[in-house]
């Protein structure tokens, strides 16, 4: 098998058929040895029924797999499940909403074929079709995480990428429960070439990624690939100590040389609130890391398969 398309699906009933037909149209006479690996990530609409219909109607059932998870485990877990079931020499992660065009996949394939030393071709968003505020926040996230993380993140890069089998196998060895795919795909290394692409409008439906979900995902990435927040607690403590010493010196000098008594009640209230807030912040950061360790120590599966159609 030359190519596997890993397609995570969550409530994409209006898109999966359009995606399937469009890929077949674009790939016709250009790519023949390929498969679809659809991952139903606990959808609550008719996504699974539509995927079963695609599988049952396909004249070439050998090139369609439908993997249905027992509940919604999240896109990153669905991607891991898809990579586990993909059998192609090259594997491409692509969304079902047609915002990532099949023509770009052909471009990626051509680059891999012409460059044997390249292990991965990843796409980054050349143009963001979103509000200025959202675009600024995403750019800010990449600037922050690149300063504090142990690996580099390309601004605008997504999970949309084509990988050779050796890289896919390396990603599958990363069995952490809390998954941040952008970081994992960068952490494993390998020679990666980045190409620009334009995000198209969704073929159907609305995006599942609101501000709150994006914020939690960004926090997940920072905690997963940086220990800087833990070190920040040390810096905050040291800064508070230095400020306290300086303030003490000021109070003593004013008392000895000017005879001025500093009002005690207001000072105490401010210091208690300040130090209490800093302590809670540091405890919250520590708790975030401890919670990840706690969940990982349970050794729970990353995903659970409820149903599988097709041949692996």
PLM features: residue spans?
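Acceptor/aglycone-binding surface of glycosyltransferases and processive sugar-polymer synthases
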Residues: 63, 67-71, 75-85, 90, ...
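Short, conserved catalytic or interaction motifs in soluble domains
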Residues: 71, 96-98, 165, 197, ...
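Hydrophobic helical membrane-anchoring modules
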Residues: 180-312
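Short conserved micro-motifs on helix faces and helix-strand junctions that flank
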Residues: 8, 69-71, 116, 161, ...
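Residues in soluble alpha-helical coiled-coils and helical-bundle/repeat scaffolds
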Residues: 11-14, 99, 103, 172, ...
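Amphipathic alpha-helical segments that mediate coupling or scaffolding at interfaces
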Residues: 8, 26, 54, 69, ...
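Residue-level signature of catalytic and energy-coupling elements of molecular machines
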Residues: 5, 23, 82, 97, ...
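Structured catalytic core of nucleotide-sugar glycosyltransferases
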Residues: 1-132
